[in-house]
Regions:
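Amphipathic coiled-coil signal-transmission "stalk" helices
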Residues: 3-6, 10-28, 39, 43-46
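Metal-dependent catalytic cores of enzymes that make or break cyclic nucleotides
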Residues: 37-181
Length: 181
């Protein structure tokens, strides 16, 4: 009985530590997202909207189609990584990033660089770049503006060449832009 009680205490301790680690991870993701949004003068809710929409789209994809065999853990990882989708905007000139009205073609070319900047930032994290969260965040950063017909950027990927993580976040990002003021 003593051994069982000790085992239960250890299991509770490990469980508490895992929950604390997850909470800290979520907190860091939110802090980084807020830094980018603060600089970009976005609503501050954009990243939260993207995460919620990504979760909803993934849930629908898994439940209603046979197109993807994503596990609940993979869905959670994609939703968490979605917060990094615009992290590369931190490298874009604020005058362009916050310009009211239509961008010139040259300015739009600069804005498009945020996908490559974000992917590069994540790729330079040598210590963590093999971590699943960073790999998925890289895919999302780089390819969330790709289009199924191949007319997106930065690489002009076509159809299923676009990772499912980037496809889902792309839909969430466009939807949020359409419903936001």
């Amino acid at each position: 009985i003593k051994l069982y009680a000790k085992q239960r205490r250890l299991m509770t301790l490990v469980s508490d530590q895992i929950l604390e680690k997850e909470k800290n991870n979520q907190m860091m993701v939110e802090v980084l997202s807020q830094i980018v949004e603060f600089r970009n003068e976005e609503s501050g809710l954009h990243v939260l909207h993207i995460k919620i929409l990504t979760e909803m789209l993934l849930e629908y994809l898994v439940q209603k189609t046979d197109k993807s065999e994503l596990s609940p853990d993979e869905c959670h990882m994609i939703a968490t990584a979605s917060a990094f989708h615009d992290i590369g905007k931190i490298g874009i000139d604020e005058k362009i990033l916050n310009k009211p009205g239509k961008l010139t073609p040259e300015e739009f070319e600069q804005i498009k660089q945020h996908t490559l900047i974000g992917a590069s930032m994540l790729d330079k994290m040598d210590r963590y770049k093999d971590e699943p969260l960073i790999k998925i965040a890289y895919q999302i950063c780089r390819w969330h503006h790709e289009r199924y017909d191949g007319r997106g950027y930065p690489d002009g990927l076509f159809g299923e060449e676009i990772p499912i993580s980037a496809q889902i976040v792309s839909i969430a990002d466009v939807y949020d832009a359409l419903i936001s003021e």
